Regions:
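Short, Lys/Arg-enriched N-terminal segments with co-localized hydrophobic residues
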Residues: 4-21
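Carbohydrate-active catalytic/glycan-binding domains of CAZyme proteins
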Residues: 17-18, 40-590
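Hydrophobic alpha-helical segments, especially transmembrane helices
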Residues: 24-25, 538
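Bacterial N-terminal signal peptides
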Residues: 28-36
Length: 590
């Protein structure tokens, strides 16, 4: 089933630790059957790209039997490293996180675009291995598990590795290795962006690497042309030859994927004379619905023998040639064809395809939360835990949110911490997965002072966000819209850009808040009665939250957020539900 017209309520899902009644099971079965009939009337084996919409960059994939597992970078969001499962490569259900215990992951003080970079996942002799880099705090590490659902071990640090993007390779002769992006020879760069790919022996039992380091690639495909940022390496053995793939060009418009080949795992590695094997940098930036910045790929082979690639890419909004996007770097899928002994990604098309056929029969009725195409997801907070797609800013160190204090509601304690600081504020977010869409909440909150605020954020980083909230002024309830002040490191680094007093009787009543994404603008709306919306402010600059303006490596998130702006508070905000809807223009042109 391709989830193109998918609406799902979390109260209809089976969650771990929560038993379903037969009536609920029957209802879910009928709902899924109806969805399958609707979807299959349109297509039997097609799927939408990106397969993971929103900021899910640096994908790595492995197959175990008929099951596929995929992980992505999560930077300074917690839990760390989301892990997804699929049976058909096209439809992915998040099954958890690799680093989901505070003792595994210390993100305190790290900026949003620091933290966890470029995980790589592999399976070997009954064990799942995942390598990753925690930038600025700890460096490179490996964790293991007997089950992708977890629990995963605590990180085993690899201090010998000087670099980022570690990737394990298990050879068929019993030897194991970790390769990674590292410093130039003698740490003397010939130009800005000069990096290398290096490798060490890896003991899969002790989880230690050898002291001997091998240099596999210096600079990139052709060092005379000053290639930059060779990174994200992986090795595969196919028909007796070793293939090393890596990203080159930097993770922006010049991004690409290149390949090298050797008869020996230790090299020498010879570059393909028709590199790159994946890029979009040569295409007209004014083309309709471009996918840009493609690279950082990983490969997987199906049981039937076909090869596929997952990789990151970006989707700018109109006008396309300006290169603005707020959804971050997303995960795409494309077929791999072998030509003259070399793997070529997306060989039948110049442009990355938004819709394509998959060789594996699409698994209908999986029941998971959709991650591709157009969809609506509504969380009514009736489960005993948050769903996996929710995320926090950095590692929680105290209990500040709950699902049991008020039945069917998510409660957030107002605390002094704010999203403009490198701390863990009262922030529960989910990714913006569409260029056009909305996020809506129903909020119950009675502010006790002017500095108490609760509502919904659209957040890119500590310096770039908009905050639509309920608060008070002079004891009267008010709806306010704030914009962050870039470069201001104070607790309240935001300026008021719109406000509207509420009816005095609404001070203790519910208020509905909505943020609508409209490509290069956002609109902010509120209501005190269902479906009777008032526009607080429209045409708000969305490029302020774009990667091009805000910088960094992440995309925007919608978040439920409550703060007392540096002052003590004993107040609580309660969210009755949160609804996300996405309907990009590209999906309307079927």
């Amino acid at each position: 089933m391709c989830r193109r017209n998918f609406v799902i309520h979390l109260t209809q899902l089976h969650l771990p630790g929560r038993e379903l009644s037969m009536k609920r099971v029957l209802f879910l079965y009928l709902l899924l059957c109806a969805s399958v009939v609707c979807s299959l009337s349109q297509t039997k084996d097609a799927c939408d790209n990106p397969i993971l919409s929103g900021f899910y960059p640096d994908p790595s994939i492995c197959r175990v039997g008929e099951d596929y597992y995929l992980v992505c970078s999560s930077f300074s969001y917690y839990p760390g490293i989301p892990i997804f499962h699929s049976k058909d490569l096209a439809h992915w259900n998040q099954i958890g996180h690799v680093l989901d215990r505070p003792e595994q992951l210390d993100l305190d003080g790290q900026g949003v675009s620091r933290g966890l970079f470029a995980p790589a996942i592999r399976y070997h002799e009954g064990i799942y291995y995942l390598t990753c880099t925690q930038v600025d705090k700890g460096g490179n590490f490996v964790v293991t598990s007997m089950n992708p659902l977890g629990p995963w071990s605590k990180p085993v640090w690899l201090p010998e590795i000087n670099g980022i993007d570690p990737s394990p390779f298990f050879d068929d002769d019993g030897k194991s290795y970790i390769l990674y992006n590292s410093i130039p020879p003698d740490n003397k760069p010939l130009y800005d962006g000069h990096r290398t790919i290096r490798m060490r022996r890896f003991d899969a039992d002790s989880l230690k690497v050898s002291s001997e380091e091998l240099l596999l690639v210096n600079g990139g495909v052709d060092i005379s042309k000053k290639p930059v940022w060779i990174e994200g390496p992986h090795i595969f053995k196919v028909d007796g030859s070793y293939y090393l793939i890596a990203a080159e060009g930097g993770t922006a418009g010049q991004h690409s994927e290149v390949v090298f080949r050797s008869k020996n795992v230790t090299g020498p590695y010879v570059p393909y004379d028709k590199n790159p094997i994946l890029t979009q940098r040569h295409l007209d930036p004014r083309r309709d619905f471009p996918v840009t910045s493609t690279g950082h790929a990983d490969l997987v082979q199906t049981p039937a023998g076909s090869w596929w690639a997952v990789f990151l890419g970006c989707r700018p909004y109109r006008p396309f040639d300006r290169g603005y996007y707020n959804t971050g770097r997303e995960t795409f899928l494309a077929p791999v064809v072998w030509k003259d002994g070399w793997p070529i990604i997306n060989s039948d098309h110049e442009q990355i395809q938004f819709r394509f056929s998959v060789p594996i029969k699409v698994k209908a009725g999986s029941g998971g939360i959709p991650n591709s195409g157009k969809f609506v997801v509504r969380d009514e907070f009736k489960a005993d835990r948050l769903d996996f797609y929710w995320t926090f800013l950095r590692t929680p160190r105290e209990s500040w949110y709950g699902l049991s204090e008020r039945k069917g509601m998510l409660t957030l304690k107002l605390r002094p911490q704010t999203c403009s600081e490198p701390t863990n504020p009262s922030f529960v977010g989910r990714r913006q997965q569409h260029l056009v869409g909305s996020a809506t909440v129903k909020l119950e909150f009675s502010p006790k002072s002017d500095h108490e605020k609760a509502g919904i954020l659209i957040f890119q980083n500590e310096d770039h966000f908009y905050f639509l909230c309920k608060s008070s002024t002079g004891g009267a309830p008010i709806v306010q819209l704030f914009r962050s002040i870039a470069g201001d490191k104070s607790v309240s680094n935001m300026e008021l850009i719109a406000s509207k007093r509420l009816e005095s009787s609404s001070g203790t009543k519910s208020v509905y808040l909505r943020i609508e994404a409209r490509g290069e603008t956002y609109a902010f709306l509120y209501s005190v009665r269902p479906a009777k919306w008032t526009l607080l402010k429209g045409g708000v600059d969305a490029t302020f939250l774009s990667t091009r303006v805000a910088g960094g490596f992440v995309g925007s998130l919608y978040a439920m957020y409550a703060t007392s702006l540096g002052a003590p508070s004993d107040n609580t905000a309660a969210f009755d539900w949160f609804e996300y809807a996405g309907n990009d223009e590209r999906y309307k042109k079927r």
